[in-house]
């Protein structure tokens, strides 16, 4: 077997030399304010000497330039104040955002590497990976500043190179990265640092294949135990599986990630769309989808409701509304239209329960809200052709609450009683 990429901890000499040259190039700027103007001038000083002719070297040179500037911009704030990215000053934050945008644009272009790529080109790539890894696990800055670059260099540049190789060689390379990451366990108890370390390992294990999914997911769940964990920081597991059209494995990951994603509402719409793609290709996975969506409750309530309506599960939708104490006033008429058209009688308890809830406030605002729902309820009884039943109800309702003058006024305004 052959190690396709020299996975090592030390940064390659050529990459070190680039960074040394960067420092010399921007020295005339001194310790200026780390804003967009500073980074623009610094990049101009570095690039004015020209770029390497070799397209692979040029891409890696530019990437290292942006990464170096990212380090320079972020480090002073975090070294002096021990703060994270969220605490950066406004202008510094803009500079970081611009650099990260440039990095993303660079990764969007393929790195022209093949199985016959020269040793020198591989060393540039390996050295750049080492640099990113070191910065990601550095105790002097927010690890997630460089975590995204770590993921992108694997997804966009290294993994495409591995696709030209035999399976055993790919596994050997990924194993080497896992082993190195394990050796680099952060000594600091800093939460973001540990999370980056766990998630980096999780991602490499994920790329090794389905047989490592349990290991990968266990690392995610470990990271998710931290209070400051954000699901948005997770690598693109779901997108990767979608690109591979691996629907069975995608269904498994969607199910297993539900407990993690329920911690935050972000990206749940995307999560629901992934399920739609799975069910389109793999209809037998529908029971898994319902299990996963139930795990997302209560945070994923809206997603769950939408799915119940789109799949025509009217009774389950209504049971959920009643148990959750939801209010029909919070829904647009168009949102309830599928139920009105297919099972309108099921909406009756939903409206009646909400009316009583608003009545319990015992103030004019509550009465107004109740009357608004009663007007919609009247239309619903008319739709199901049970107007006599409605007339009996509203008459008894008004009589039962005859002493509530404010309510009586609202009922008359709503033309519900004479």
Regions inferred by a protein language model and the residue ranges of each:
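Eukaryote-biased, non-catalytic alpha-solenoid scaffold regions
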Residues: 2-418
């Amino acid at each position: 077997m052959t190690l396709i990429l020299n996975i090592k901890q030390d940064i390659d000499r050529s990459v070190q030399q680039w960074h040394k040259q960067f420092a010399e190039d921007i020295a005339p700027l001194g310790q200026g304010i780390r804003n967009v103007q500073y980074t623009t001038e610094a990049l101009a000083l570095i690039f004015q000497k020209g770029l390497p002719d070799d397209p692979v070297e040029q891409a890696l040179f530019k990437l290292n330039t942006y990464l170096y500037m990212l380090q320079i911009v972020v480090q002073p704030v975090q070294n002096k104040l021990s703060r994270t990215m969220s605490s950066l000053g406004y202008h510094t934050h803009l500079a970081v955002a611009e650099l990260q945008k440039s990095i993303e644009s660079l990764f969007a272009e393929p790195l022209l590497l093949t199985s016959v790529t020269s040793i020198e080109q591989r060393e540039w790539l390996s050295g750049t990976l080492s640099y990113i890894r070191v910065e990601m696990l550095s105790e002097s800055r927010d690890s997630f500043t460089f975590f995204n670059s770590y993921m992108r260099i694997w997804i966009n540049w290294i993994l495409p190179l591995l696709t030209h190789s035999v399976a055993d060689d790919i596994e050997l390379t990924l194993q080497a990265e896992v082993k190195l990451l394990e050796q680099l366990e952060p000594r600091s108890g800093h939460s973001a640092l540990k999370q980056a370390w766990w998630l980096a390992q999780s991602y490499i294990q994920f790329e090794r294949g389905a047989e490592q999914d349990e290991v990968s997911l266990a690392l995610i769940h470990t990271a998710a135990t931290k209070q400051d964990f954000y699901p948005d920081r997770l690598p693109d597991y779901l997108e990767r599986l979608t690109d591979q059209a691996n629907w069975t494995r995608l269904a498994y990951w969607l199910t297993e990630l539900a407990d993690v994603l329920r911690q935050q509402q972000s990206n749940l719409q995307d999560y629901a769309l992934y399920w739609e793609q799975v069910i389109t290709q793999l209809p037998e996975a529908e029971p898994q989808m319902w299990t996963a969506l139930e795990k997302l409750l209560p945070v994923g309530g809206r997603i769950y409701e939408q799915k119940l309506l789109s799949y025509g599960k009217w009774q389950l939708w209504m049971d959920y509304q009643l148990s959750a104490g939801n209010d029909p006033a919070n829904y647009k008429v168009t949102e309830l239209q599928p139920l009105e058209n297919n099972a309108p009688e099921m909406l009756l308890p939903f409206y009646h329960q909400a009316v009583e809830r608003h009545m319990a406030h015992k103030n004019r605002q509550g009465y107004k809200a109740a009357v608004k729902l009663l007007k919609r309820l009247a239309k619903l009884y008319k739709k199901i052709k049970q107007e006599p039943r409605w007339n009996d109800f509203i008459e008894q309702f008004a009589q039962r609450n005859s002493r509530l003058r404010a309510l009586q006024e609202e009922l008359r305004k709503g033309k519900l009683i004479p």
